[in-house]
Amino acid sequence: MTVTPLGVPTISRPAAGMPTTGPLVDTFGRIATDLRVSLTDRCNLRCTYCMPAEGLDWLPGEQLLSADELIRLLRIAVTRLGITNVRFTGGEPLVVRHLEDVVAATGALRPRPEMAMTTNGIGLAKRARALKAAGLDRVNVSLDSVDAAHFARITRRDRLGDVLAGLAAAKEAGLTPVKVNAVLDPDTGLDDAVSLLRYCLDHGYQLRIIEQMPLDAEHQWQRGRSLEAAGILAALRAHFTLVPDSKPRGSAPAQLWRVDGGTATVGVIASVSEAFCAACDRTRLTADGQVRNCLFAREESDLRRLLRGGADDDAIEQAWRAAMWTKAAGHGINDPGFEQPSRPMSAIGG
């Protein structure tokens, strides 16, 4: 097999003192119960903050997990490691033909995990009902602007209508609450935030605005060029009354604000300016079978090699535990020596 190099060291050291049973824990006592599963690195958009206009060299098909391999890892995660929430991501998960099969197989596990999907919404209008029937509980749809010109400039595709149709279909199919994930453009983002919130309020969607993170394929991210939570909230407050939500945040990444005295909320995920790593409960599985204990991890643990080498479930479970045991205290974005991970977001999964 020819392996596409991603420049990421692989964990090979033993994890001294690591628990071999019980929750999926790290040395700081954080317990991972939320699994992010990247089904593919392919995407049908070319968002400026994610990849170049010409796209990327996709991972070869033989390096990707098969549906059966993925389902086996999902079973281990849920029945042995205590995973209670599974989110399917990409790339773009809707380009994966066996998506509904994987969702259905995951829903058949016991205890049944909560299942969500993050998607750009293109093609969702045609598949929302089938995904709901397969067992998917809810969706987050990435939408950075409801201005057609802004959307086309950000995504390099004229597909806003398809995304809006996907949102409507998801709501109709019962994939609720429907959430909208927005990464704001530095030039138009403050205006876009206001119009996005109005659109979401009008249609019954929940808006989540995410600070742009250094995960772009071209490594062009600049702290000073990205909009941060304080500025975003100030722009929203010029048009809406925002009151902090009284519900405990727990491990949720979004700080929620109630809008105009009603029950609707808007969330801001301040991954860079107000990191929440101490409450992180996530573990990540890439489309090519690598476990990552953080979006910004510099190391990975290769479960695909174990799968294809004949390892039993016990060995795979312990390898996954070892990967999470060594999770760093935080992502380190604000540290002087921070290095952006070699994998772009499209090959990690959101």
UniProtKB/Swiss-Prot annotation:
Record: residues binding [4Fe-4S] cluster 1: 43, 47, 50
Assembly information from the UniProt record: Monomer and homodimer.
Keyword Iron: yes
Catalytic activity line of the entry: GTP + AH2 + S-adenosyl-L-methionine = (8S)-3',8-cyclo-7,8-dihydroguanosine 5'-triphosphate + 5'-deoxyadenosine + L-methionine + A + H(+)
Statement: the UniProt record of this protein carries the keyword Chaperone: no
Organism: Mycobacterium sp. (strain KMS)
Residue numbers binding [4Fe-4S] cluster 2: 277, 280, 294
Listed NCBIfam families: moaA
Protein name: GTP 3',8-cyclase
Database matches in HAMAP family: MoaA_B (MF_01225_B)
Sequence positions that bind GTP: 36, 87, 118, 179, 282-284
SUPFAM superfamilies: Radical SAM enzymes
Every Radical SAM core domain range: 27-245
InterPro entries referenced in this protein's UniProt entry, alphabetically: Aldolase_TIM (IPR013785), Elp3/MiaA/NifB-like_rSAM (IPR006638), MoaA (IPR013483), MoaA_NifB_PqqE_Fe-S-bd_CS (IPR000385), MoaA_twitch (IPR010505), MoCo_biosynth_MoaA/MoaC (IPR050105), rSAM (IPR007197)
Function: Catalyzes the cyclization of GTP to (8S)-3',8-cyclo-7,8-dihydroguanosine 5'-triphosphate.
Pathway the protein contributes to: Cofactor biosynthesis; molybdopterin biosynthesis
Keyword annotations of the record: 4Fe-4S, GTP-binding, Iron, Iron-sulfur, Lyase, Metal-binding, Molybdenum cofactor biosynthesis, Nucleotide-binding, S-adenosyl-L-methionine
EC number: 4.1.99.22
